[in-house]
Curated annotation (Swiss-Prot):
GO terms for cellular component: cytoplasm; membrane; nucleus. It comes from the Eukaryota. Residues 1-22 are annotated as: Disordered. SUPFAM superfamilies: Ricin B-like lectins. This is Calcium up-regulated protein C. Keywords: Cytoplasm, Lectin, Membrane, Repeat. Induction: Induced by high levels of extracellular Ca(2+). InterPro entries: Ca_Up-reg_Membrane_Reg, Ricin_B-like_lectins, Ricin_B_lectin. The gene is cupC. May play an important role in stabilizing and/or regulating the cell membrane during Ca(2+) stress or certain stages of development. GO terms for molecular function: carbohydrate binding. It is a peripheral membrane protein. It comes from Dictyostelium discoideum (Social amoeba). It is found in: Cytoplasm; Membrane. The keyword Transmembrane helix does not apply.
Length: 769
């Protein structure tokens, strides 16, 4: 069964509109707010997929997709609302096109949602959703309105809506970019390369810092002992801790789940001091700008293309129709009497059309000069809007095509540096969406003011394509591809992304409402996160940053095919002769070398492409964020038990999600160890264990998330042969993955008898749609 959620946990409310659609494949997002106010007679509630009443703040669980035929899908599109077999409670199930109990009618006039299978109405029973005969109670009254989900899952800034006296934006910042827990979160001017200002809002309402895995926004100490005023801190990610869960309401306020009446604001004057304190307090009013925030990028195009279609003004008869057809013929030199059909055509000049329409005069055959003038002004407006919308997308397409124009050559050059055979059938984890998302992240982190325009268009195109793929039940997994097919895979996805942007542009150009809203964004100041104003953008700088980021993404895909990390725990000898291929922290020393030779390191020409371009050594050597190198454990020049390292294999679980995980490794009834895996980090099972005799030895691994939910189970096969390093693999048919997750291709590297290092295996885990 499903529940309703407190309205204080909701996000942006939109203008209420009649819900409708024009295509059987199209699904429009909406939210449903109950007019029932609960026992306190104050708090209304949202229809929610949450399993518990006070669970989360994310808008995704309160956003639904209405299809043309009356199905109500979850925001992911995986499940639909249905009436249970008992005919009372409402539940989420797989789509069954033949089931009428999955069809609903939303009556926005009378605020009712009726089930077509049994004729009953959506109702509330002790915060659970049910259906019941019409009874007139407030529990059966629902206000439905349009909205698009807030940007979750992508990195960006949280900026105050209030600018300083020099029109600079200020944003949430971790003090001094510290990765230590209980560090103050303050306000600083938004700056390039300030990783402490980059955050990610997760689907359950946590706000992750890009500084480190598991580092989240939390409530800090009380201000002068107050129960309603607190500072903000960072802290370690905790399970089911409402103080670490946040939401964004209709007033663009970031509120806390534990204290839903308290919101994030700041005390002080922006621009006077270099750092301003953030507070959690109750705003003096809904419009208090010190408590209002903007996500950067806003992905404003996502919201626009999810709007209810708004057709162009209709001219169906009389002088209005005659004026429209006459002006269409004049504009196009007799080509068509329907000029709107050409707004999406790439082979026409809308600028020439505009001049022709402007110079046209009312012919004697049209009696109403007022009708003619009204149509003429409307067409001029449409052409003005269309010209500017096309210009934005044309500039994006030009940027995007230049980025990938040397794709084949660049991939070949990198393959030669890494010593990869691009004709082989070796499988790599080559997710294109992750690669292009990393490009947009690089742009906004290097150019926070203006770079968000490119990210706005690009990420919106990605989302637009994914929604289209869901509607058409298409889109195979992109997490695994052979080297011989990698370029074709990347090129195909590049073309798909170009097509997605083109399709989104055409969707906007064919809808008066979408075109009007997009045009308005074209003239916002460039520093506005919602802006599409490309005037003054330094495309050369943007292209340089994007090219480096895409090159790095390609290295991330190719590097694990020939290199791995050799880890030596702290206190033991490790032969380091160059910082180019090594990294040391408090846990030990990490050395990058070939997978079959721990003494053969990557060439300087390759490492220069990393370190000279600002790539984090910590992220590379610990397989954090986009990096996924397998890790072998080795003890150099050791005797005794450590001389048998070649008999062992050490699994690494790479967590590509925003939820902390842990995995338990067992051998029969013996527990080898429990290992934590931070968000976007890798966890290495580095515990030394007894390997046994020659032959196959099996180790079971169970992966769960921080809330105790199962993620995946599999068995590692550690095969010992005489005078050889161990062979490691995932035992056939042992992998079980829970819904909502995808396990990528494991990287399996043999150990070495002669060099004394262990086998390594890395298992990447992704969140699926």
């Amino acid at each position: 069964m499903i529940n309703i959620e407190d309205i204080s946990k909701s996000s942006n409310q939109s203008e209420e509109k009649q819900l409708k659609s024009t295509s059987s494949k199209t699904k429009y997002p909406f939210a449903a707010k109950s007019l029932f106010k609960g026992s306190n007679n104050i708090t209304p509630y949202y229809l929610s997929t949450s399993n518990t009443f006070q669970c989360v703040a994310s808008e995704s669980i309160q956003t639904w997709l209405l299809s043309d035929d009356g199905h109500i899908f979850t925001s992911s599109g995986n499940f639909v609302l249905d009436v249970s077999s008992g005919g009372y409670f409402v539940e989420l199930v797989q789509l069954n096109s033949n089931s009428k109990t999955q069809i609903w009618t939303i009556d926005t006039t009378n605020n009712k949602i009726q089930n077509q299978g049994n004729g009953k109405y959506l109702d509330i029973d002790n915060l659970n959703i049910c259906v019941a005969p019409l009874n007139g109670n407030a529990t059966q009254k629902w206000t439905t309105f349009r909205r698009a989900p807030i940007p979750t899952g992508n990195w960006g800034y949280f900026q105050s809506k209030k600018l300083d006296s020099n029109n600079n934006y200020w944003g949430l910042s971790v003090l001094n970019n510290s990765t230590s827990y209980n560090t103050s979160v303050v306000m600083n001017k938004v700056q390039a390369k300030s990783i402490g200002q980059i955050w990610q809002m997760t689907n359950d309402g946590h706000i992750l810092s890009r500084l480190d895995g598991n580092l989240v926004l939390d409530i800090g100490p009380s201000i002068n002992g107050s129960k309603t005023n607190y500072y903000l801190n960072t802290n370690v990610y905790k399970a089911n801790d409402l103080m670490q869960q946040w939401g964004i309401n209709e007033n663009n306020q970031i509120f806390n789940q534990y204290y839903p009446n308290l919101c994030i604001g700041f005390v002080g004057e922006l621009g006077v001091d270099s750092t301003v304190n953030c507070v959690l307090a109750q705003p003096t009013s809904a419009g208090n700008i010190n408590f209002q925030w903007i996500a950067n990028p806003t992905y404003s195009l996502n919201q626009i293309v999810s709007e209810v279609p708004e057709p162009f003004p209709a001219y169906t008869s009389g002088d209005l129709l005659a004026s429209y057809q006459y002006l269409s013929n004049i504009a196009t030199n007799g080509y068509t009497d329907d000029i709107r059909s050409l707004y999406t055509s790439i082979n026409v000049s809308l600028e020439i059309f505009y001049v022709n329409v402007t110079n046209a005069t009312c012919p004697s055959s049209i009696h109403s000069t007022e009708d003619f003038s009204n149509v003429q002004n409307q067409i001029k407006n449409e052409l003005t809007y269309a010209i500017n919308v096309r210009l934005v997308f044309d500039n994006y397409s030009d940027f995007y095509s230049k980025l990938f124009s040397q794709g084949s050559t660049n991939l070949t050059n990198l393959a030669n540096l890494i010593n990869v055979d691009m004709s082989s059938d070796q499988v790599v984890n080559g997710d294109y969406t992750d690669a292009i998302t990393s490009v947009f992240y690089a742009i906004i982190s290097e150019i926070p003011i203006g770079g968000s325009i490119i990210a706005n268009i690009g990420e919106s195109a990605v989302e637009f394509g994914e929604l289209d793929a869901e509607s058409n039940d298409s889109g195979p997994s992109t997490y695994q591809v052979t080297l011989s097919k990698l370029y074709d895979h990347l090129n195909e996805n590049y073309e798909n992304e170009m097509a997605n942007a083109q399709s989104m542009k055409n969707t906007i150009l064919q809808d008066w409402g979408m075109m009007s809203k997009t045009f308005a964004l074209c003239f916002l100041p460039t520093n506005n996160p919602s802006s599409l104003n490309i005037n003054g953008l330094d495309f050369q700088k943007i292209s340089t940053i994007a090219s480096i980021a895409y090159q790095t993404a390609m290295i991330q895909m190719l590097l694990p095919t020939n290199y791995q990390i050799y880890f030596t725990p702290a206190g033991y000898y490790a032969p380091v002769s160059s910082d180019d291929y090594s990294y040391t922290d408090s846990t030990g020393t990490y050395i990058m070398a070939e997978i079959d030779n721990c003494n053969s390191h990557p060439p300087k020409a390759l490492t220069d492409k990393l370190w000279n371009n600002g790539v984090s050594k910590q992220e590379v050597f610990t397989s954090s964020y986009g990096w996924n190198l397998a890790t072998s454990v080795t003890y150099y020049n050791m005797v005794g038990k450590y001389s048998g390292m070649f008999k062992l294999s050490f699994p690494t679980v790479k967590n590509f999600t925003s939820v902390p995980m842990q995995f338990v490794m067992t051998n029969g009834s013996d527990r080898v160890g429990t290992f934590n895996v931070k968000t976007h980090f890798a966890g290495l099972a580095s515990t030394y264990y007894y390997s046994g005799a020659l032959g196959h030895h099996y180790y079971d691994i169970a992966v769960i998330d921080i809330n105790g939910n199962k993620v995946a189970n599999f068995t590692v096969d550690n095969n010992l042969e005489a005078l050889e390093g161990s062979y490691v693999s995932i035992k056939t048919n042992s992998l079980v993955v829970q819904p909502g997750y995808v396990v990528g291709n494991p990287t399996c590297n043999q150990g070495s008898f002669s060099q004394g290092f262990a086998a390594s295996i890395l298992i990447p885990i992704y969140k699926s749609n």
